[in-house]
Amino acid sequence: MASEERGLRKTKVGVVVSSKMDKTVVVRVERIYSHPQYAKVVRDSKKYYAHNGLDVSEGDKVKIQETRPISKLKRWRVVERVS
């Protein structure tokens, strides 16, 4: 069991919109897709609460990775700062 590999975890890239909480940031992830019926390009965004272990601040572009539940809302953690 110890040599068993962990499955791939989801990763997303977004912008930090809030870093006022202690060790927690809010990351906005934007998704652009074509509407299936009307073929219009739609821009959609979603906010994720992520554990901040790298001390990132507002406006930073970061990569977040899925992890175990850390609190009621946090299921993601900041992996790296993307330039």
Swiss-Prot record:
Gene3D superfamilies: Nucleic acid-binding proteins (2.40.50.140). One of the primary rRNA binding proteins, it binds specifically to the 5'-end of 16S ribosomal RNA. GO terms for cellular component: cytosolic small ribosomal subunit. This is Small ribosomal subunit protein uS17. HAMAP family: Ribosomal_uS17_B. The gene is rpsQ. Belongs to the universal ribosomal protein uS17 family. The keyword RNA-binding applies. It holds the Pfam family Ribosomal_S17. Part of the 30S ribosomal subunit. Coiled coil: none annotated.
